[in-house]
Amino acid sequence: MNDKNTLKGTTTVGITCKDGVVFATERRASMGNLIAHKATDKIFKIDEHIAATIAGSVADAQSLMKYLKAEAALYRMRNSEKISIEAAAALAANILHSSRFYPFIVQTLLGGVDENGAKIYSLDPSGGMIPDKFVSTGSGSPVAYGVLEDRYSDELYVDEAVDVAIRAIKSAMERDTYSGNGILVATVTEEEGFRMLSEEEIQKRIENLN
């Protein structure tokens, strides 16, 4: 199986909140019309205060995530402090841009919380870096954006935004054939740092939405 062809059909969502950020994805990896994997991890912990999502090639995405994790850890050791969200996003953008002639086939959302507050950046394969209050990537993003546009507010807190993110991913899964097989949700707050929600917690929230 050629990993370059997997994970093309994906839906990811990122939301900035007053007290942190929320990331959500579905779990299906596709290869053309074939469902290649049904339990794909698409949210990664880069550091205690930074998370990222992936859409694109499995091999490229995993390589980029490992690179960013290593650089964040190295920065912490060298400087005795955490890398800022903007600096981590700029690092990812530089990695992507330097490889633009043999690009990473990946679109990444990277965000977290630092002394400057909660931030999320969208990064494309050529190294473009755009800050967003809310953003979605992948084949299901047009559907997800409909939910985000309707329900996003600058006054959202993480607990509320989790429900918005789940609703956006759930809607995309219902309309996009390349998205499905469950939902992953992670939050990053100043108090708790990175936290991945359990399947039970996500399922309970889905039931409450219904």
Swiss-Prot record:
Keywords: Autocatalytic cleavage, Cytoplasm, Hydrolase, Protease, Proteasome, Threonine protease, Zymogen. Belongs to the peptidase T1B family. It holds the Pfam family Proteasome. Transmembrane segments: none annotated. It is found in: Cytoplasm. Coiled coil: none annotated. The formation of the proteasomal ATPase PAN-20S proteasome complex, via the docking of the C-termini of PAN into the intersubunit pockets in the alpha-rings, triggers opening of the gate for substrate entry. Interconversion between the open-gate and close-gate conformations leads to a dynamic regulation of the 20S proteasome proteolysis activity. The 20S proteasome core is composed of 14 alpha and 14 beta subunits that assemble into four stacked heptameric rings, resulting in a barrel-shaped structure. The two inner rings, each composed of seven catalytic beta subunits, are sandwiched by two outer rings, each composed of seven alpha subunits. The catalytic chamber with the active sites is on the inside of the barrel. Has a gated structure, the ends of the cylinder being occluded by the N-termini of the alpha-subunits. Is capped at one or both ends by the proteasome regulatory ATPase, PAN. GO terms for molecular function: threonine-type endopeptidase activity. It is an enzyme of class 3 (hydrolase). Its EC number is 3.4.25.1. It catalyses: Cleavage of peptide bonds with very broad specificity. Its main location: cytoplasm. The lineage of its organism: Archaea, Methanobacteriati, Methanobacteriota, Methanomada group, Methanobacteria. HAMAP family: Proteasome_B_A. This is Proteasome subunit beta. Component of the proteasome core, a large protease complex with broad specificity involved in protein degradation. The gene is psmB. The active site is at T10. GO terms for cellular component: cytoplasm; proteasome core complex, beta-subunit complex. GO terms for biological process: proteasomal protein catabolic process. It comes from Methanothermobacter thermautotrophicus (strain ATCC 29096 / DSM 1053 / JCM 10044 / NBRC 100330 / Delta H). Residues 1-9 form a propeptide. Signal peptide: none annotated. InterPro entries: Ntn_hydrolases_N (IPR029055), Pept_T1A_Psome_bsu_arc (IPR019983), Pept_T1A_subB (IPR000243), Proteasome_bsu_CS (IPR016050), Proteasome_sua/b (IPR001353), Proteasome_suB-type (IPR023333).
